[in-house]
From Swiss-Prot:
SUPFAM superfamilies reported for this sequence: Bacterial exopeptidase dimerisation domain, Zn-dependent exopeptidases
Family: Belongs to the peptidase M20A family.
Active-site residues (renumbered): E207
InterPro entries: ArgE/DapE_CS, Bact_exopeptidase_dim_dom, Peptidase_M20, Peptidase_M20_dimer, Peptidase_M20A
Keyword terms of this UniProt record: Glycoprotein, Hydrolase, Metal-binding, Protease, Secreted, Signal, Zinc
Highest rank taxon of the organism: Eukaryota
GO cellular component, one term: extracellular region
Protein name, per record: Probable carboxypeptidase ACLA_088580
One Gene Ontology MF term: metal ion binding
BP GO annotations: proteolysis
Positions that bind Zn(2+) 1: D175, E208
Amino acid sequence: MRSLTLLLSLSTALRSVAAPHPASPQGQIPLGGIPSASTSEVGIGIGIGIEEDPFPPAAGSGHNDLEDVINASPLLSFHRDLVSIESISGHEARAAAFVADFLEAHNFTVVKQPVAGDRVNIFASPRAHAHSRPEILLTSHLDTVPPFIPYSLHRNDSRPTDRQLIRIAGRGAVDAKASVAAQIFAALDILHADPSAPLGLLFVVGEEVGGDGMKAFSHDPRLNPAPSRFHTVIFGEPTDFALVAGHKGMLGFEVLASGRPAHSGYPWLGRSAVSAILPALRRVDALGHIPVHHGGLPASHKYGRTTLNIGVLEGGVATNVVPAAARADVAVRLAAGSVDDARAIIAAAVADATHRDPAVVVDFSRHLEAYPPQDLDVDVPGFEITTVNYGTDVPNLHLHPRPDGPVKRYLYGPGSIFVAHGENEGLTVGALEEAVGGYKKLVQAALERTRA
């Protein structure tokens, strides 16, 4: 219901003013600042007005005008068509076929690398380079999280033609189909100006659920030979146009407790698994705040504290039964150190908190996939620099060593991680167009570095 209200909003148009990254937890030292929303998503003003969506769904003639904006742009219409295809993890086949057909129509040689069932990765290189191998790889992912949200357009009625205020919404509109579209059109622009540019494109499946697509690429000697053909890899994820200096590592584990069932009126006849697990979980929950020399998990200047999330807690069958089993599932975002060291710290902490109770154990067997913090390159000028706490396919791409030194790895993309995976996922027309320039800048820097 509409209501009169005092509207307060803060402009984020002052992008040049550095501010702590909104993803930074207490104690994390940001390497640079990016705002939590783009200038197209938050306006400035104070006054009495009608409270309503600043980006209402387009309707009537205005809707037709917005469709004309999209139809007039190959980039925007490609992005629209890709976002309109449902590609929840495990069901990426239609999206992969669409991207493959588009690239083949634009003079790319396309390899459809099998992953599982009808799921394929798309690896492409310019058809004119049939006898050479790409050296600069742009990569992102085709899958999205559920649920599917259809593509839609929204406008700000006060400035309906401002490309920074025309908002594109839908599942994957940001994560990561905006990166896919911007990378493809950056490559097309570069190849038009420099047909010899040794570019490759890789769009994988399964990034959101363990990275099986990128792992399949890594293990394919045809596409990923030794030594590595690539001297530069540019990963596409929502970074709000910042270059990411790295992201935290990740591991997971379960805490399992066993007890003995009994009638809850006579609890001394049994043993509560829930009561047994609680001291362990209290300690686990605090490990990111405990100094290492007191048995806690490490922190770093770059990434801040290690954080833990007890995401699942299960136990018991009824309130009148002493619970015979309890289980907790925990995710760790690791700020420093190795996975093995972190696992040892966690196991020791649980043992200490439970006085080495054999009925309470730590189990890492269901979370074998783990990785330490991932440091990335940020040596291209003209970008803000930050760190992020989310995971990516960076640790899933295993490249063979090159004789001339390590492979450069960059992480960049349009859109905010704070709307990715949410019901309001979206970005503006202007943001998507700006990202093409960002990817071109990264590619040009790689070309200049190697040709020099």
